[in-house]
Amino acid sequence: MEVNILAVIATALFVLIPTAFLLILYVKTESAGS
């Protein structure tokens, strides 16, 4: 089974970018709260 590298990269970015964005927002909110 051939693995499509571009598909893997696209999937990784599609998952990691929103996760990192939400994590940054969460940290900023926690810092502002305290």
UniProtKB/Swiss-Prot annotation:
SUPFAM superfamilies documented for this protein: Photosystem II reaction center protein M, PsbM
Top-level taxon of the source organism: Eukaryota
Location (main, coarse): plastid
GO biological process terms held by the UniProt record: photosynthesis, light reaction
Transmembrane parts of this sequence: 5-25
Keywords assigned: Chloroplast, Membrane, Photosynthesis, Photosystem II, Plastid, Reaction center, Thylakoid, Transmembrane, Transmembrane helix
Transmembrane helix recorded as keyword: yes
Disulfide bond entries: none
UniProt GO cellular component terms: chloroplast thylakoid membrane; photosystem II
Subcellular location: Plastid, Chloroplast thylakoid membrane
Membrane topology qualifier: Single-pass membrane protein
Function as written in the Swiss-Prot or TrEMBL entry: One of the components of the core complex of photosystem II (PSII). PSII is a light-driven water:plastoquinone oxidoreductase that uses light energy to abstract electrons from H(2)O, generating O(2) and a proton gradient subsequently used for ATP formation. It consists of a core antenna complex that captures photons, and an electron transfer chain that converts photonic excitation into a charge separation. This subunit is found at the monomer-monomer interface.
Annotated family: Belongs to the PsbM family.
Binding partners and assembly: PSII is composed of 1 copy each of membrane proteins PsbA, PsbB, PsbC, PsbD, PsbE, PsbF, PsbH, PsbI, PsbJ, PsbK, PsbL, PsbM, PsbT, PsbX, PsbY, PsbZ, Psb30/Ycf12, at least 3 peripheral proteins of the oxygen-evolving complex and a large number of cofactors. It forms dimeric complexes.
Protein name: Photosystem II reaction center protein M
Originating organism: Chaetosphaeridium globosum (Charophycean green alga)
